UniProtKB/Swiss-Prot annotation:
Region described as N-acetyltransferase: 254-464
GO cellular component, one term: membrane
Region (Linker): 233-253
Protein name: Bifunctional protein GlmU
Top-level enzyme category: transferase
Metabolic or biological pathway: Nucleotide-sugar biosynthesis; UDP-N-acetyl-alpha-D-glucosamine biosynthesis; N-acetyl-alpha-D-glucosamine 1-phosphate from alpha-D-glucosamine 6-phosphate (route II): step 2/2; Nucleotide-sugar biosynthesis; UDP-N-acetyl-alpha-D-glucosamine biosynthesis; UDP-N-acetyl-alpha-D-glucosamine from N-acetyl-alpha-D-glucosamine 1-phosphate: step 1/1; Bacterial outer membrane biogenesis; LPS lipid A biosynthesis
Record lineage: Bacteria, Pseudomonadati, Thermodesulfobacteriota, Desulfuromonadia, Desulfuromonadales
Residues engaged in binding acetyl-CoA: 389-390, 408, 426, 443
GO molecular-function term, one example from the UniProt record: magnesium ion binding
Record region (Pyrophosphorylase): 1-232
Amino acid sequence: MKHDELAAVILAAGKGTRMKSEQPKVLHPIAGKPMVTFPVAGALKHGCQPTVLVVGHGAEAVQAELAEDPVSFALQSEQLGTGHALLCARQALQEFSGTLLLLCGDVPLLRDETLERLIAEHEKTRAAVTVLTAELSQPFGYGRILREGDEVLGIVEEKDASSEQKTIREINTGIYAFEAPFVFEALSGVGCDNAQREYYLTDVLAAARAAGRRVGAVVLEDADEAMGINDRVQLAQASALMRRRINENLMRAGVSFIDPEQTYIEPQVEIGPDSVIYPGVCLGGDTRIGSGCLIEAQVTIRDCQLADNVHVKPGSVLEGSRVGSDTAIGPMAHLRPGTVLAGHNKIGNFVETKKAHIGLGSKASHLTYIGDAELGANVNIGCGTITCNYDGVNKHKTVIEDDVFVGSDTQFVAPVHIGRNSLIGAGSTITKDVPPNALALSRSQQRVVADWRLRHDPKCKNKD
């Protein structure tokens, strides 16, 4: 939906004492991403320009985390309440006259659809203030919404509320839509005559009422969206809610989960329909998984692209790799960054690859290291094969062309080039290039000494 001019201020200055951490509270992760990135993404998705973050404790760390986002920052050097925090952003918004959203950096679960409802209601009613509210069975600690019928009269904080007001279940989420010029004018007249000696943003509602302006409200359909994070217990609770939301969205899109409560997927991960995800799987970063894939238990995949019909067996780790279709990986395989599998491959148990391009149909079934290597199509790598790529100073490349058969327990001392359709005998150490269609052997000739043990081992002398 097209909206009037939009801007956003995101409050991210709090120290988060109850987190008991040197790290700023808003940088603690939810589903693998710093929690502040969720409201930032929501504001930017709705076209909020400018988007201003009010920072304080750990300001440099927060700025560094968001350095690539089109946002600006305002410093709140002293924590004097939410009203004071918004005033700190005034200079960055002095030319702005549209709808101003106020979001919280420690409220990461707010859905885009909810933000859309808040904006639409605020613009439709032409209110000076529209507050996002929620109904809680246990509202202790939250500011209560004071109403007269459908009209919002104000908000009273927990420490300032009367006994009767504390029975109200509708609470302030701390998320607002304001008419920008009005809110800054109203804040200029706000004092700190309250129990906390802070500048309450909620006093703006009283100023709007006094000016005869409308104060509106939008009630959350799901109160969990307004969950603020103040300690590590709430961090874990919010993480579980986000995980459930991500997994349910994927299930509705055609992905099967054996146990969604034990599966950890970051929000930007994409999975195609008819894929099956087992418990203990962790998928993160820029990961895209195709259709019909099977990801078995205790697999970790980060920053990888998997084509259709890929089978990743238990205990495998994939990082920064591309995997072609109809490929089997694992169990207990490790694909390190720079691995590219063309498709129809087998990378078996205890195989490690790094900066390896492996051609169509090639396989390494077990106990192998392939690093800084280029393999052609239909190459068979025998058990125990190692590309010796590092000389203590530099890395070197191994090239193995199409249709090569490599026997077990082979070492390729790079740089080395193996021609197509050649055969490498088991137990060989290959230090020189091998031409196409050749047999290469480097092991010594077998020698048999008859009765050697009977002559040299006292334990065996009486067994003749």
